[in-house]
């Protein structure tokens, strides 16, 4: 399990926490501002509110050829073509401000909220950011929350910049780069000794077409669909309720 301490804007007397990959919340967590991600326990618990969480998990400890063989035919083709023809370079992003700038540029294109730099700084010791570059410029970045003890990595953010919306070939190259980067990430973390690659979520039984497309993309890498639990502590739920009244 990892625990991320989040500073509150209005007071330093109380801290909020995000905890990841615990079996289940501690009883004492109900009196703290705690949100638990990806717990193994599947039932209700006293002092916390449960939310069902689905995700796709891949065993990356297996042989590399078997890992690739589990991919769908199209995904294998995209990964191989990108690796053989697209002149991509794999890299790690060591500076959180570099990722923040890239992600916020992506968010602006998608009309999404910008990332909070305070939260990113708190998470950074538990994050690994990878990139696929072409001619020295990043086409795709992936951010992972990593837990060495659990031997698990969780895809938290994926960001892509479309340089020139009319350039269809570049769009196709970026699509291949995204597939390729997922594969390179798996190989990188495998070499680092991790065993479980977590796609970060799965929109179970969704009727939303765009979310269905995301599910299909994740399905194309194989893996197992699993149910887990996110839990909100009683204290955090109460605080959110108070804020909703304002």
Predicted regions and their residues:
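C-terminal catalytic domain of photolyase/cryptochrome flavoproteins
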Residues: 198-246
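N-terminal accessory interaction module
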Residues: 1-44
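A conserved beta-strand-loop-helix scaffold within acyl/acetyltransferase catalytic domains
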Residues: 2-7, 36-51, 55-63, 67-170, ...
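Conserved acetyl-CoA-binding loop-helix of GNAT-fold acetyltransferases
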Residues: 165-189
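Active-site-proximal structural scaffolding
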Residues: 125, 175-178, 211
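Conserved acyl-CoA
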Residues: 21-30, 180-196
């Amino acid at each position: 399990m990892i625990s991320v301490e989040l500073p509150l804007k209005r007071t330093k007397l109380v801290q909020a926490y995000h905890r990841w990959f615990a079996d289940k919340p501690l009883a004492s967590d109900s009196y703290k501002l705690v949100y638990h991600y990806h717990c193994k326990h599947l039932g209700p618990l006293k002092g916390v509110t449960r939310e069902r969480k689905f995700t796709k998990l891949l065993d990356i400890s297996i042989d590399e050829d078997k890992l690739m063989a589990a991919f769908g035919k199209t995904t294998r083709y995209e990964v191989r073509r990108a690796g053989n023809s697209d002149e991509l370079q794999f890299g790690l992003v060591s500076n959180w401000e570099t990722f923040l700038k890239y992600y916020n540029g992506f968010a602006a294109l998608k009309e999404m909220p910008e990332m909070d730099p305070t939260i990113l700084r708190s998470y950074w010791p538990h994050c690994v950011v990878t990139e696929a570059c072409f001619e020295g410029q990043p086409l795709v970045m992936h951010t992972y929350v990593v837990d060495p003890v659990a031997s698990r990595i969780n895809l938290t953010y994926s960001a892509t910049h479309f340089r020139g919306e009319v350039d269809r070939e570049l769009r196709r190259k970026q699509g291949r780069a995204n597939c390729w980067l997922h594969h390179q990430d798996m190989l990188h973390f495998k070499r680092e000794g991790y065993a479980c690659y977590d796609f970060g979520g799965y929109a179970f039984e969704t009727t939303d077409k765009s979310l269905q497309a995301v599910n299909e993309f994740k399905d194309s890498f194989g893996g197992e669909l699993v149910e887990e639990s996110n839990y909100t502590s009683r204290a955090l739920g109460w605080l959110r309720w108070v804020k909703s009244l304002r």
